[in-house]
Regions:
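TRNA-recognition modules of translation machinery and tRNA-sensing kinases, especially anticodon-binding
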Residues: 1-169
């Protein structure tokens, strides 16, 4: 698959990234996308938790997908071995149906991660930002922890994600 695109980046380089900094990066990307397009975008968010929480979740996903993996696409078979979290990002309709019943990461978050996870929607609600929680949103890179997001054009919905990012430490 070939793609051509323009991109920009904004990163906070810090040893301790707090919730405010994470939300600042999200709001910067959201505002930039809306300014560039001239209209609202759809913001989808998820929370991947710490590395420890994510490892527990990966184990649960492996157990869930094990009975299904033989009937899944080749990408999902590879992802099952390498990183089962990425199966949630599969675009094959039959595999998406299986993913609907997969465990949710929020059930595998540590107590500390649970607190941070609960603060994100509250903070966005407090400032009036519209968003959708998408349990299947995992992003393509393994270094993300905590909040992840993708932005979609609300008018030209065939584009797929027009932006994305998240927290990594």
């Amino acid at each position: 698959r070939l793609r051509q695109f323009y991109q920009f980046g904004a990163e906070f380089i810090d040893t301790k990234i707090d919730l405010a900094s994470t939300l600042d990066a999200f709001l910067f990307a959201l505002t930039a996308a809306e300014k560039a397009l001239g209209h609202k975008v759809i913001a989808k968010i998820n929370f991947l938790g710490s590395l420890e929480s994510r490892e527990n979740y990966k184990a649960a996903l492996k157990a869930f997908f094990a009975p299904h993996v033989d009937s899944m696409c080749d990408d999902c078979k590879r992802r099952f071995e390498v990183n089962p979290l990425r199966i949630l990002d599969c675009k094959v309709q039959e595999d998406q149906e299986i993913c609907k019943d997969a465990p949710k990461i929020k059930d595998y978050l540590s107590e500390e991660d649970q607190k941070e996870y609960q603060n994100i929607p509250k903070a966005l609600d407090d400032i009036g930002v519209s968003y959708e929680v998408d349990d299947s949103l995992v992003r393509g890179l393994d270094y993300y922890t905590g909040l992840v997001f993708e932005l979609y054009d609300s008018i030209n919905t065939t584009l797929g994600a027009i932006g994305g990012g998240g927290k990594y430490a």
